């Protein structure tokens, strides 16, 4: 059927050329997009076609210069094949997509075949009179006009999606191969039996609720400014053994000591409770009943004498400073107390270092060698918020304490093992001592 048999409108649609000044606009139907256009063909696509907007083609095409700015010109690059003409396991030939850049395409030809590691070669396109097949794209009005000149004389290369999938699979294979080679190069790791961590390898944490095991030769200065949680816990209860893997159980204070030693140790612990603010201040006359002996002791320290060389050391409880009320034992608590406390309290055995700092010297100056190999702090009690380091034992006017008599130095390791008292018993016993 010749062109003379068509209507003038149909003739215009069929006889247009991409280089015409005016292209037909009375197009009733548009063509479906063609992925592999070949030979001398022409297509009219809708301007809404996304593939036509992208000028997509499965042939390896690159943009070329054109004197007409309204027309996009693309030339075919051909196909890259294996020089050995190898095939994959599925029976397909190796037809790679050529790189668009000239340098990248030259570098691609020096690579080996991904299937047989043979050399690659480029088959150029010469389907348009010895020149590459050319595709033309032109946007005009509501349509996109496409025209191809020439016939491809080479096999179809892989599409862009196939090329991307092949590169991804190649990267995965290379990564797995390198990992396998790395694992083969390493010596086989011997499976070690599970080791139970020893006591020395475990972290040693300082806590108020659990015991801490220190070396027997540990020596540290006694810091007067104790933490607030430890202000009411001067009586410590020590376990016979300490195990990091098990629970620590405290001994019953009344099961190992009689009532006389029990009273004696509680009296010693009461003399070690003092305030953090008053430890740096000199005593005031009238506060203590034995102020003159305290002055004599302070003078000896100022003259350079070591307080540890004296025969005895006074243990003075601090005065009631800023608590708004006093602690007095109840009648019910006093009814059961005479059954445990003897009628004549024995004299406290001196020999420990006083915790009262030297007024003329630096704080925390005196040091005491303490064996803390099995110390376990007792339960903590939170004192009032005003002065957490002051504890009252009754009215200041009623306190009368006698100086301890001369005696041999008591065993520090034994006497430091004070019993852990709860808040009620500690308060009850210390108030009873002040009333007597």
From Swiss-Prot:
Q: Which GO terms describe its biological process?
A: astrocyte fate commitment; branching involved in labyrinthine layer morphogenesis; cell differentiation involved in embryonic placenta development; positive regulation of DNA-templated transcription; positive regulation of syncytium formation by plasma membrane fusion; positive regulation of transcription by RNA polymerase II; regulation of cell differentiation involved in embryonic placenta development; regulation of DNA-templated transcription
InterPro entries named in the record:
GCM, GCM_dom_sf, GCM_large, GCM_small, Tscrpt_reg_GCM
Q: Where does Zn(2+) 1 bind?
A: 76, 125, 152, 154
> PTMs?
Polyubiquitinated in the presence of UBE2D2 and FBXW2 (in vitro).
Q: Which organism is it from?
A: Mus musculus (Mouse)
Binding-site residues for Zn(2+) 2, renumbered to this chain: 82, 86, 113, 116
The UniProt keywords, alphabetically, are: Developmental protein, DNA-binding, Metal-binding, Nucleus, Transcription, Transcription regulation, Ubl conjugation, Zinc
PROSITE patterns this protein is in? GCM (PS50807)
Question: Tissue-wise, where is it found?
Answer: Placenta specific.
Recorded consequence of changing residue 125 to A = Loss of transcription activation
Protein name, UniProt field: Chorion-specific transcription factor GCMa
